[in-house]
């Protein structure tokens, strides 16, 4: 059995990204674990598992952090979760294909906190752009770069 594994912070993960991950898990015979506080539809596969955690703030995040190992990849748009993953020596990739690294995570956390403070003071900051075909392609390309090592 491979030491490599992909974890997905699945509650907010776009469906097109899940589909890419399902195909990759099958193609590479690689364990894929989707963690969510609700049931997620997954195809029948010996490589794909779903973990349903209890409701509550960051319960899925805590589960992933507890189980992740340095050879694992975590798919998440949650920047604080990505920071914890990096601290454990694993890799974190967001659904738009951006790899979180030791070099960029502090800047990402700072910007996230700044935007949260602005919203807290009543400033309308807007949200991220809609998930696009370009985002899907960027994710697939980044995932493929990681899969080459597996």
From Swiss-Prot:
It holds the Pfam family DUF188. InterPro entries: UPF0178. Belongs to the UPF0178 family. PANTHER family: UPF0178 PROTEIN YAII (PTHR35146:SF1). This is UPF0178 protein Sbal195_1808.
